[in-house]
Amino acid sequence: MAISQVANTGIPKGARVILFGSQARGDAKEGSDWDVLVLIDKERLSPSDHDLYSYPFWELGWKIDAMIHPAVYTLSDWNTKANPIFRTNVERDGIVLC
């Protein structure tokens, strides 16, 4: 799976990457998008962090003609500020890529 390869080699070490949504559940249809959660262990994200961690997934999407939507959070924000329903869905259905 190319998305797993990007997760393991295309983004800086230390990030936790989780595939979620229909692709993770196995009920994706042709043309379904890919949803990826990127968790960063730092206090605050800068605009350049969003680009640094998102761009490799966007680039893969352009290459394979697929929509890949990375959601980038600090661990702290994920645990305290992320929508609880979103968190529950990721925790239930997510596949850890790295």
Regions found by a protein language model. Give the residues of each.
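Short beta-strand->loop micro-motif that forms the acidic, two-metal-ion catalytic signature
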Residues: W34-L39
